[in-house]
Amino acid sequence: MYRTCWKVSRSRTADGSVVNFVIFIVAVALAFDFINGFHDSANSIATIVGTRVLSPLAAVIWAAVFNFSALFFVGTGVAKALAAGFIDLNVVDPNVILGGLLGAIIWNLLTWYFGIPSSSSHALIGGYAGAAVSKAGITALLWGRKWIETLSAIVLSPAAGMLMGFVLMVVVLNLFRRVTSTKADRFFRVAQLTSSALLSLAHGANDAQKTMGIIVGLLVASQALFAGETGILRHMYVTSLDTIPLWVELGAYTMISLGTLSGGWRIVHTMGTRITKLRPVGGFCAETGGALVILFATRFGIPVSTTHTITGAIVGVGATNRLSAVRWGLASKIVWAWVITIPAAAAMAAITYQLLAAFNPL
């Protein structure tokens, strides 16, 4: 059992106002998951659309199916890490969670509008941290292994993606050096269906779990509200961060898949064609390299950015042709967007938390 530092009066509990507020925040968290799928769908489909293997509509359907299928293949290590590894749970209350979510949502929508492939994952972590610090100061952050891993991943995940994309492309080009480009393209158009599916599964596996972690952290912090419930609300009584309710898993994977179906065409254009021109063989290597890095991180419970990783893989593939094949000016702008994501989302969440606390004190 976890102690919580926020108190609820009997009258407010009795009339259900706080219970309804917590339920509303769960809905907002699932809405963030939808926006994550909408915003980051480009990660999974940019290369397969850029190489014209699938139309945008067919690509998002393909990606959504494999986003959801991650439910059956991966655990919940990332969710547990986000729930317990970053913020002191004794600081968490519904306003902190809602402030963090709204900060991340605002940043995601701004970057989507301007077609910038920033990280939904780091926006969520930054928003969560910003709201907690706004409430309790810097001591709200649990400085330790998970922060080190996540901050390191900001640099290492795109670098690892770039290296994997580069190495796979070199290996594949050597293996197929005696095959005509027409035959190679025909083969990799089919192979890219597999690599795109693998990347979509990796995206769902890592990103949907971040929303699960936020919801479970909220439910554990709010457990006193749901103790003794016998109706449907009994499913919201969670006392341990080690247990992810099935309805939370189903909800998170469903919403990220529906978001992916909605697409994010501005970012698809940026990542699929503007960073570097790709042929099917390049798309296959970028997707496979990016997916392997993300799945490796997911296996060890590290919340990485799928956006960072696949963009790095695309750059690595482009660099095997010649360095000038990569539009480094555009790539540098994307890097700057990555750098400012955590502090920008944190600032927005901090302001949002203060507004919520002023108008809805708990």
Please provide the spans of the model-predicted regions.
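Multi-pass alpha-helical transmembrane bundle typical of ion/small-solute transporters
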Residues: 5-6, 12-362
